[in-house]
């Protein structure tokens, strides 16, 4: 069968299944692919449970994660769906951002109600900035008591509201992933209803090209007779020839300049956009004024900071991480985008030490300023070896 061309005509949305172990995240993922395959056979292939459950390993910021990606389409949208089978994999994926989510389906078994990992996943989704959650009340075929179902639904709504999600209005859809997967028409319809709710309730994501321009500097060199060129991959936004930019971070001063040329693969372009590897010719800037680790940005949109709070995952010994815990005033390097900057760690009150394999919140004071916004990911390294990963949750200074 010929592979269908990736249509850019539909909005593309990244989603994932989250929730307590054995509540049916992977079964639901398989059921969604089956139901959508039956409904729109030319748009979708069905993925078997085993295909999704035997998740391949992937590396993100030096951390190995087992994670499954499936894709499917509804009438309105193209979806990329991630399912991290293991609890630790889920935590690592959320913190490293291996697979970012525009929204999540929280799977809660009607037979159990919200469990400890349900709470932890919702808390983590809030910390890492998942914008929207809706609920699949799974295994609803196993609960005959309507009042019990209503009670579980109420508990889930309260849990969402407690983490600042819209618990009052979030869709809660009663499904049976297993029955839908077995081909039961009535329960299959509930999964179709769930996807209608996903279509309706998860907002269209803002495309990277629509955000303000930012390019991390990877390299700087001089072209005789033309001036200084900074190279890198455009992280977001668009840059046009003759636009003003600022080069910020690492140094104490901000350099203001104008982009007089954009090159890609030795060809001159009118513009570079998110995802492009480009060289920017910058006017009146000396080579020594710019270094790797800085960022080129639309003026006034990004500022450098030295103090922040972050949510981090520390690698276990088996994952190639530290063999010993670390304490207050730990001084590793924080790798932001293209460079390492040393920082001093302060642990939360009441935490004496952090063990390999833990996830925790920390405060960090960097020795050089780094251009950052809330949500920026980083790796924690010791002498070039990754020992953890994290995400900026709050900028202090």
UniProtKB/Swiss-Prot annotation:
Binding residues for Mg(2+): 26
SUPFAM superfamilies: EF-Tu/eEF-1alpha/eIF2-gamma C-terminal domain (SSF50465), P-loop containing nucleoside triphosphate hydrolases (SSF52540), Translation proteins (SSF50447)
Cellular component aspect of the GO annotation: cytosol
Enzyme class: hydrolase
Residues covered by region (G4): 138-141
Region (G3): 83-86
Keyword annotations from UniProtKB, A to Z: Cytoplasm, Elongation factor, GTP-binding, Hydrolase, Magnesium, Metal-binding, Nucleotide-binding, Protein biosynthesis
Disulfide bonds: none
Region spans: G5: 176-178
Region: G1, residue numbers: 19-26
InterPro entries for this protein: EF-Tu_GTP-bd, EF-Tu_GTPase, EFTu-like_2, EFTU_2, G_TR_CS, P-loop_NTPase, Small_GTP-bd, T_Tr_GTP-bd_dom
Location of the tr-type G domain: 10-206
Gene3D superfamilies the UniProt entry points to: P-loop containing nucleotide triphosphate hydrolases, Translation factors
Family matches, as CDD domains: EF_Tu (cd01884), EFTU_II (cd03697), EFTU_III (cd03707)
Record text on subunit structure and interactions: Monomer.
Family assignment from sequence similarity: Belongs to the TRAFAC class translation factor GTPase superfamily. Classic translation factor GTPase family. EF-Tu/EF-1A subfamily.
NCBIfam families (UniProt xref): EF-Tu, PRK00049.1, PRK12735.1, PRK12736.1, small_GTP
The protein's name in its UniProt record: Elongation factor Tu
Organism whose genome encodes this protein: Mycobacteroides abscessus (strain ATCC 19977 / DSM 44196 / CCUG 20993 / CIP 104536 / JCM 13569 / NCTC 13031 / TMC 1543 / L948) (Mycobacterium abscessus)
């Amino acid at each position: 069968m010929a592979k269908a061309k990736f249509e850019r005509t539909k909005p593309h949305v990244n989603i994932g299944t989250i929730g307590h172990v054995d509540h049916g995240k992977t079964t639901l993922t398989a059921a969604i692919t089956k139901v959508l395959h039956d409904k729109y056979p030319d748009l979708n292939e069905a993925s078997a449970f085993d295909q999704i459950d035997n998740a391949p390993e992937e590396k993100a910021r030096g951390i190995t994660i087992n994670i499954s990606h499936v894709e499917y389409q509804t009438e309105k949208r193209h979806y990329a769906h991630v399912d991290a089978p293991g609890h630790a994999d889920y935590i690592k994926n959320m913190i490293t951002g291996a697979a970012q989510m525009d929204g999540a389906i929280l799977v809660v078994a009607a037979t159990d109600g919200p469990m400890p990992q349900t709470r932890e996943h919702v808390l983590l989704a809030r910390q890492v900035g998942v914008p929207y959650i809706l609920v699949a009340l799974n295994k609803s075929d196993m609960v005959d008591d309507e009042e019990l179902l209503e009670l579980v639904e109420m508990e889930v709504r309260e849990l969402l509201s407690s983490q600042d999600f819209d618990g009052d209005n979030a869709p809660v859809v009663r499904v049976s992933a297993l029955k839908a997967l077995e081909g039961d028409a009535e329960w299959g319809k509930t999964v179709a209803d769930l996807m209608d709710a996903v279509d309706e309730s998860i907002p269209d994501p803002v495309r990277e090209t629509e955000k303000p321009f930012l390019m991390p500097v990877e390299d700087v060199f001089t072209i005789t007779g033309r001036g200084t060129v900074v190279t890198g991959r455009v992280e977001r936004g668009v840059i046009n020839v003759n636009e003003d930019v600022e080069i910020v971070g690492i140094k104490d001063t901000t350099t203001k300049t104008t982009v007089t040329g954009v090159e890609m693969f030795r060809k001159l372009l009118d513009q570079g956009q998110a995802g492009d590897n480009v060289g920017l010719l910058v006017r009146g800037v000396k080579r020594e004024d710019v270094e790797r680790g800085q960022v080129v940005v639309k003026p006034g949109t990004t500022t450098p900071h030295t103090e922040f709070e972050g949510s981090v995952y520390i690698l276990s010994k088996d994952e190639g991480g530290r063999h010993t815990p670390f304490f207050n005033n730990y001084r590793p390097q924080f790798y932001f985008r293209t460079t390492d900057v040393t920082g001093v760690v302060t642990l939360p009150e009441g935490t004496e030490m952090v063990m390999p394999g833990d996830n925790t919140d920390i405060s960090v004071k960097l020795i050089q300023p780094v251009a950052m916004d809330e949500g920026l990911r980083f790796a924690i390294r010791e002498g070039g070896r990754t020992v953890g990963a994290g995400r900026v949750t709050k900028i202090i200074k």
